[in-house]
Amino acid sequence: MVKEKKKADKKGEKSARSPSSLSDNLDFSKQDGNTTRQEMSPAGVPLLGMQLNEVKPKKDRQNVQQNEDASQYEESILTKLIVESYEGEKVRGLYEGEGFAAFQGGCTYRGMFSEGLMHGQGTYIWADGLKYEGDFVKNVPMNHGVYTWPDGSMYEGEVVNGMRNGFGMFKCSTQPVSYIGHWCNGKRHGKGSIYYNQEGTCWYEGDWVQNIKKGWGIRCYKSGNIYEGQWEDNMRHGEGRMRWLTTNEEYTGRWERGIQNGFGTHTWFLKRIRSSQYPLRNEYIGEFVNGYRHGRGKFYYASGAMYDGEWVSNKKHGMGRLTFKNGRVYEGAFSNDHIAGFPDLEVEFISCLDLSSGVAPRLSRSAELIRKLDGSESHSVLGSSIELDLNLLLDMYPETVQPEEKKQVEYAVLRNITELRRIYSFYSSLGCGHSLDNTFLMTKLHFWRFLKDCKFHHHKLTLADMDRILSANNDIPVEEIHSPFTTILLRTFLNYLLHLAYHIYHEEFQKRSPSLFLCFTKLMTENIRPNACQIKGNLFREQQRTLYSMSYMNKCWEIYLAYCRPSAAPPHEPTMKMRHFLWMLKDFKMINKELTAATFMEVIAEDNRFIYDGIDSNFEPELVFLEFFEALLSFAFICVTDQMTKSYTNVPADDVSGNKHETIYTILNQDAQNKSPSAVMSHESDAAHSDSARSSSSKLELSPDVNKIRKSEPKIKKSVSHERVSKMNFKLTGKGITFFSSESKKYERPKDDREEEFNTWVNNTYVFFVNTLFHAYKREEAIKEKIRADRLRSTAQAQQRKMEDDELEARLNIFILREEEAKRHDYEVDITVLKEPADVSSSHLILDPPKEDVTVSPSSKTITSKKKKK
């Protein structure tokens, strides 16, 4: 029998320290383990050519841990447990089953006992108020349990030998701090997340080593700034990216003890003003030392200028190359952020760099000097903002007339530049939402529409032919010659017009001078002025329909590429002929009584009189994607009947991939996103065209997607894309979805018949693309995939059969060889057997000695004499 007061099993002497508190090396929202520098961005953007008075980056003034160890949450020790009283069952003098024990010193336990030990579920309360509820194994807290401290702090999770070990959650009551993740020996260790406020806006998620942030993790600060990367000793250390959302900055690169050190990229995102045409950012790519731009690096300015050279403490110092936005270059020494030797040029350089208009700067002696430094002196009447590439065209003329040809055609462009800018702006804005800076970038899709509106294709040239002509003058990859996503700057647009003018009219004016001037003038007179900005076709005719049609563009481009074939003309890029288009529809089983071959020809030839005259058809012309897509939009209204749309009166907005309501730049941005390594975009800005080559990769941001419609709540909703640009509203009617631009609120609502017409068009378009075209394409691709699989399987089976046949043939050959070998062996044995008697007799003849005269015995004589007597 065990006495009431006895010493418990020595296993009860095992320590069971409580979980160390979150204040063990924890960083709170206001402090992050090293300095207040943690959320500060590095030095600001320098002004080019002028000394920068910028705030010096704050270094680590102290690397002391915060006062985070003020209050500790540690386990009390299960000391030598002397039982003062016990209430419960006993078996053979040992505590067994459920009971209550009070220990010497004020600790208590209520729960399960086994063989005199705390074993199973129970609650242990220390004298200081610390409580453990959970599993016990032989007097030791084990497996899963809950620690509760006197101040209300709590841990729930896995416990090993009384220590937090495994996965668990800790919540501090005195401060809004909580941790959920892995533990080891009472410390945060492994993967875990810590939250520094109740709102959950300040947190760290990542790797821990012994209560220290070490490894890879994400830190979100209360201000919204975010760091994602490597950590060491609670500080940013290694490769990582910091985004200062409050100041629209971003740094990606090397860190050392919380500060930029090593190679990295720092970007300052800008908000552009109305009518600006600059890129979206200033960007530095190069070396950093203690948060400063120091060493070798490149700085790309928002104006289009660029400095490549040496830096010292955020200042241009040493040898460098400065390229202005107009293409002029200075290469030489810099001192303390100034161009060495030319201090009087600073103000003029800055004003030249920051010009926001297309007007050429007033030339002075110093500006002319800079032009001559790099040998780029130019006398173009268009100024430095627009550079026409006329070398290939001028090579068509004798050298003696080239200067005059160039001068006259530049004068012609200058006289029409205002109108050409307006045309460029008009077409580049088609299918786009509202732009914050009123600037749009033309794409090949817009350019094709411009060419068709101005009837360029009426001069025995298809759009595909024009693409090949223009690509021959540029280093364009073969697969991108007919891409609708290719962007076209204003100067490129002007160059394209000059090249097309020459190819269309040069035979007419080849004997007159200045020939190129006359070609361009006639193009403006007969093609562009009478027809530009008069939209034809059915893609860009109405803004609402354009925005909705763009949701199907990506999938249609995929289908177009799938059915292209190499062109017969160099460079043999993939194109689609009309006959290929018709064959595709036939394969899709879409040629029927509604859409006949004759109807197909009428739609294709709607704005091209040379393809079909009502009797004869020409199926050889190639189609670019614009013609392909517009034809599909026309087929949608022809193929889909009212009966087919009855079951689709409520069109889901995002039922299938690609069926989302977006602007053209959503589509273009998605396609070009991977092509532009420097396309780091601001979340609150749109892209624009710029004379700088760096801006050519920029795109307008995403437009809003359309949310799913609740049939029971026909109300107006709004959806905003993650890029926070234009908005789109819609409402549900009895016949489908009606879409509105958010800007149309200030106008009068459409009439009922207009709404009805638009709803019918939306339904027809949805049914045609989603339920007919895309479904047929998917089915056809599945069939092709099955055919490919069958061919592969047949090939594999044929190879297997061939291998088996070869193996069988080899075995037969081996068998035949063995039989022949056996026969040959038997034959040799027979020959040997037949030869043996002869060999034996011959051997006897040879080996026997010569016989002597025979001596007749007397008996033999007697026998002979007897025969004679008879």
UniProtKB/Swiss-Prot annotation:
Residue spans with biased composition (Basic and acidic residues)?
1-16, 683-692
Output compositional bias ranges, type Polar residues. 17-39
GO CC, any one term? 9+2 motile cilium
Q: Which SUPFAM superfamilies match?
A: Histone H3 K4-specific methyltransferase SET7/9 N-terminal domain
Q: Which UniProt keywords apply?
A: Cell projection, Cilium, Coiled coil, Cytoplasm, Cytoskeleton, Flagellum, Repeat
Region entry Disordered, spans: 1-44, 674-704, 840-870
Write out the biased-composition intervals (Low complexity).
693-703
Coiled-coil regions, chain positions = 784-811
Q: Which Gene3D superfamilies match?
A: Histone H3 K4-specific methyltransferase SET7/9 N-terminal domain
Record localization? Cytoplasm, Cytoskeleton, Cilium axoneme; Cell projection, Cilium; Cell projection, Cilium, Flagellum
The yes or no answer to whether the keyword Nucleus is present is: no
Function of the protein: May function as part of the axonemal radial spoke complex 3 (RS3). Radial spoke complexes are important for ciliary motility.
Protein's UniProt name = Radial spoke head 10 homolog B2
